[in-house]
Design a protein with these regions (language model features):
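Acidic/aromatic-lined carbohydrate-recognition and catalytic surfaces
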Residues: 2-154
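Single conserved hydrophobic/aromatic residue that forms the stacking wall/gate
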Residues: 152-163
Length: 163
């Protein structure tokens, strides 16, 4: 049995969780401040929706930079502290990683759009016919395999992620 088989997961959207700056937007520091409460609730794993740099046109799933924290939410140092504080309480972290799409602001998208024959050209599917692939299902109602956990060994990384 894996640790996540009977774990209690708690999902938090950082931007709407707890504001620590007075700007009306939740922050990673706000999440840190509530960890004792989450531990008291019996949470084993905190699940964070995307908090990466994004224009926020799709609730943060439109990621512009996978290596940066959205500036309204905090810094990479705040994220590192969150991971350390979770682990100090015996809790784990799961994040959403939207690898199958990016923001239109992402450098790869911009490069592909500018030069579809260039090195990033095949990172995206370009076409003018919306009915070109009518048989493709966008939502897979018969499977939940997309909600998998990938386990990591590094303390600096997430304990798992949802792809």
């Amino acid at each position: 049995m894996s640790w996540h088989d009977n774990a209690i997961f708690y999902q938090a959207l950082v931007g709407s969780y707890k504001d620590t700056t007075g700007e009306g937007v939740g922050t990673l520091r706000g999440v840190i401040e509530k960890l004792d409460y989450l531990k008291w609730l019996g949470v084993d794993c905190l699940w964070l929706s995307p908090f990466y740099a994004s224009p926020l046109r799709d609730d943060g799933y439109d990621i512009a930079d996978y290596y940066s924290i959205h500036p309204d939410y905090g810094t990479m140092e705040d994220f590192d502290e969150l991971v350390a504080e979770l682990h100090a309480r015996g809790m784990r972290l799961m994040t959403d990683l939207a690898f199958n799409h990016t923001s239109t602001d992402h450098p790869w998208f911009q490069a592909s759009r500018t030069d579809p024959e260039g090195p990033y050209g095949d990172y995206y599917v370009w076409g003018d016919d919306p009915l070109r692939y009518p048989e493709i299902r966008i939502i897979f109602t018969d499977t939940e395999t997309s909600n998998c956990c990938l386990l990591y060994t590094s303390d600096a990384a997430d304990d798992c992620c949802r792809v």
